Amino acid sequence: MPRLFSYLLGVWLLLSQLPREIPGQSTNDFIKACGRELVRLWVEICGSVSWGRTALSLEEPQLETGPPAETMPSSITKDAEILKMMLEFVPNLPQELKATLSERQPSLRELQQSASKDSNLNFEEFKKIILNRQNEAEDKSLLELKNLGLDKHSRKKRLFRMTLSEKCCQVGCIRKDIARLC
């Protein structure tokens, strides 16, 4: 019997020494923060691994891309080289067919000139085109938001944030409340 008690005492001591929750990380502690402190706290909570794990896992790695003007001629060059190699290595291909294939293939210079003509828009014209498209898209999206009633929802969310910030500053708030805004 004394041996059983010594084992139970040993297990109890081991279990009591297990790491516990960090005191400042409790989700039920009241935090009173205003201004920059509140923003820092919000960034800490929303940017931490435990709260933002799903958002980080959904992100896809972005591929590095070069400028499109450089990519296009190189792809044209590769296609031309592949076609030339195919024409050389197919011995049974009649000369007439080889001639028609090479006639159909535009020269590399022609393809590069047509690509550069398309890309040599005046900077001001390019800027105007982009601004016009952005304005059209904004007008359409605002009209759709008004039709769907979503603009009221975003206002409510902003008002909720304002009241929560006032609450955190004056009374205090819980980490879970701040985490809901992430």
UniProtKB/Swiss-Prot annotation:
Superkingdom as given in the UniProt entry: Eukaryota
Q: Where in the cell is it found?
A: Secreted
What are the protein's GO molecular function terms? hormone activity
- PROSITE patterns from the xrefs? INSULIN
CDD domains noted in UniProt: IlGF_relaxin_like
- The secretion signal range is 1-24
- Could you tell me which Pfam families the record lists for this protein? Insulin (PF00049)
GO biological process annotation, one example = positive regulation of acrosome reaction
Q: Which SMART domains match?
A: IlGF
| Task of the protein | Relaxin is an ovarian hormone that acts with estrogen to produce dilatation of the birth canal in many mammals.
Recorded protein name is: Prorelaxin
